[in-house]
Curated annotation (Swiss-Prot):
Keywords: Ribonucleoprotein, Ribosomal protein
Pfam short name (any one): Ribosomal_L29
Name of the protein described by the UniProt record: Large ribosomal subunit protein uL29
GO-annotated cellular components: ribonucleoprotein complex; ribosome
Organism: Chloroherpeton thalassium (strain ATCC 35110 / GB-78)
InterPro entries attached to this UniProt entry: Ribosomal_uL29, Ribosomal_uL29_CS, Ribosomal_uL29_sf
Chain's gene name: rpmC
Species classification: Bacteria, Pseudomonadati, Chlorobiota, Chlorobiia, Chlorobiales
Amino acid sequence: MKKHEIASLSEDELKKQLVELKQRFADIRFNKIVEPPQNPMIFKNLRRDIARMKTALHRYQTQK
């Protein structure tokens, strides 16, 4: 996800997306043992998306 897409999400949507991304990252990481991923850059992209969402959530929480 792009930075502006994440910024447009509400706090609840961010939490939901964060859980989904963490689950997807865990699934891909687990499946890496069985067979290598088609796109190895997916790990880097997912980690960065998770970090962006955590940052946006932190902004919401500090503004309150």
